[in-house]
């Protein structure tokens, strides 16, 4: 028995992505967790090894404030970020990121990100869900198109918000909560108030959040207002969120309504853009550069839910609308010279936007059939209508004459980098989970999806692309998947999965037209893009007993027609060389790797846990895929009592040495130590504190610098040094 216990400890230390352990302080007991990855609630034990869950306790005790905090301790998952202005772009899962990752809130797709031609941040990112409103976050690592459609080519992230039933029921008809949090890295304060009520067949929830903060500090030491600056740019930000839910009905029939509004604003002094910069024979001296970025997301839902006792166990129908409105405005004052001759002295005012409206209707049913082979069938249909636009306007004022111009850097304004688009997507899907008498579970699934994209040109788009025409694109696909689960004794279960993926060209790739003669680059449209497709294989093993949990998985993904921005040549405007880029299909890209995780409660109150993730990514020319992460992991130790707990986590990564070019920055390896504690002195009060990067280590997150060329200011992209967070929660 002792040998078995020791083996479990060793496995936990060297294996892991602990269950429920993405936090500096973890609850020690191994308990079941419900996940919705298969569109049907089930315990984590029955889910494939590539599924993980981050729960509310984890989020609370990790002081999660944004997308990066949520996945901080999730090996193999990262968040590309630009802390100098834009913030968090989205999620990277197993080297695949951007809109190839399906991100949802309560099973409804959130708006797409827009990178604007490419950077590790995004002009419009996807960090637009308030973390204090989340009950849990389900993550599926790898393609999942059979159930979720073309957006799930690289994985799925479903953020599940809290519901009235999480606070009130017949036994407790009212709830009030207040939470305050502080984070030193950005000097931010956040306050969330929660009110919930229950009366007969009705229940309601209202959550209000307000946050205020500043720039996220890094380890850069140059604070000059010049291009040599390595400290993050000065910034003020504020945000608010409203989540309201109202449900009425009984145990069988229920009507559900939801309203959510998220707002985030950044005001940034672009200090690292000030001073003189050379562009060939031209020198630009910038004396003022300020940015104002705004994100507004609104979600409205209404639905009906049926819960039965016969073969039809559950059915629901949901109609929703989600609107995204972003503004990225800037003011820049500069003097342009060629040698000793002054070419211009002007101030530019830019007013850009990215807008997307999604309207949809989802229907789903769950049936159970008993017999020699037990069956659980999930089937449904979805319709989604998406409208996307990128309006841009700019005004340049000559500071000497007062003359006003609508032309800047070779572009006439107003313009649009891609035409307004309307996309209609219809899909049907079905999954049948067959459980045999010997415990073997075979789960085939199939989805059919039809996608139509129509664009419309106007003068604004023609200003950017004079030869542009309206474009129509239509494609459809069947995407199957097959999963096998085989019990191997009482404590072990083996898994094998095959799945296909499908993704139509996104709203901007085929039609983007953009040129910047000042910085010497242009993006050329490509109307011949094909839909991306993938074949994915996964093998895994799970282990569980009353005190321990472990899992290991290996994966191989092969992508065809992978859409990638490619340098296609050089043109000349005047005497200036212009590098031309275009989105093109790569014949094949492949990723493969392995992940392991474990958690072990080796003594009452004590838990050791850990996770590791290793992968490789290759492009069609054999060069490494820069977005593929280096070998990384997490190791944790926690002690928990009824009213208090302490814990520590070690986050580590090897050097990112596999890059596509010798000029690409290779992020050094690192080990970062975090500690935390929580205390519940009274039933209604809980306090928590965490210290991050205790050793004040200078390090880079791979996702923030993936594919970035080495420069003299790489410290600009470093993570925060030693910092702390504290929270206080009142619950009545």
Where are the regions a protein language model picked out?
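Outer membrane beta-barrel strand-and-loop segments of large Gram-negative receptors
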Residues: 349, 358-367, 524-530, 536, ...
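C-terminal beta-signal and adjacent terminal beta-strands/loops
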Residues: 502, 558-561, 655-659, 679-732
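Face-selective signature of the C-terminal outer-membrane beta-barrel domain
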Residues: 249, 254-262, 295-460, 469, ...
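Extracellular loop and loop/strand-boundary signature of outer-membrane beta-barrel proteins
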Residues: 177-180, 227-232, 284-291, 303, ...
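Transmembrane beta-strands of outer-membrane beta-barrel pores
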Residues: 180-186, 199-201, 210-214, 250-252, ...
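Periplasmic-side early beta-strands and strand-to-turn transitions of outer-membrane beta-barrels
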Residues: 165, 173-179, 183-190, 194-293, ...
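Acidic, small-polar-rich N-terminal luminal/periplasmic segments of exported/outer-membrane proteins
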Residues: 21-167, 187, 509, 539
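Gram-negative outer-membrane beta-barrel transporters
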Residues: 437-438, 442, 450, 555-559, ...
